[in-house]
């Protein structure tokens, strides 16, 4: 553990990153492609700024990066495209300031927030889940359809419930422990890609009118502007359906009459 810790600590000093945690985001992005040129990124729990540096590098000159932490974040040599907010993300005022700084929406929300450690594992785990849920709520508020999410959480009894809630929000979800994490750490990162913004949920039942036909012959219905593909339905049909799968901009449904 010590050798790996020293490796990333020394590497961060040599390469000018403010923390060894910068390599965690690098490795997560290398594996899952959550950051991209021109992206609008919100970084929660951003102090001292290692993740901000990586996000700014990968978003590039056309990107916008907003970092928030209750601790002060020392100004960067170049702040082009980078803004920091000092405050507590559990407070409504801070959340509003972040929304304002991000101009109301973001392509990516990342969170490396962690609780003050007590040494009591169950308590530390519960607090980390609480922070992760705060980050998820921020992602719900800020992410456009197709947006991405990365959040740190300590493994434990409440993890699966949190994971299930994240899976409800994103088309792709994975967990990963990057090499830059310490060997003895229980931290995991959950990656959610392609945020689903839909007026419906999987399992919902609806009566819909088929208004068009897709390239593969599926019927197309629209619910509050959201596109729903329905098997074995023709334009002009009115059918009862069950929603089976949701993507950021479209979903799929099956007819309930078995046609």
Swiss-Prot record:
Alphabetical list of SUPFAM superfamilies matching this protein: Nucleic acid-binding proteins (SSF50249), S-adenosyl-L-methionine-dependent methyltransferases (SSF53335)
Sequence similarity: Belongs to the class I-like SAM-binding methyltransferase superfamily. RNA methyltransferase RlmE family.
Enzyme active site: 152
Domain TRAM positions: 199-257
Enzyme class: transferase
Function of the protein: Specifically methylates the uridine in position 2552 of 23S rRNA at the 2'-O position of the ribose in the fully assembled 50S ribosomal subunit.
Any one GO cellular component localisation term in the record: cytoplasm
Subcellular location(s) per record: Cytoplasm
Record GO terms (molecular function): RNA methyltransferase activity; rRNA (uridine-2'-O-)-methyltransferase activity
Example GO BP: RNA methylation
Xref: Pfam families: FtsJ (PF01728), TRAM (PF01938)
First-listed, main subcellular location of the protein, grouped into a coarse class: cytoplasm
Descriptive protein name: Ribosomal RNA large subunit methyltransferase E
Annotated residues for binding of S-adenosyl-L-methionine: 49, 51, 69, 88, 112
InterPro entries according to UniProt: NA-bd_OB-fold, RNA_methyltr_RlmE, RNA_MeTrfase_FtsJ_dom, rRNA-MeTfrase_E, SAM-dependent_MTases_sf, TRAM_dom
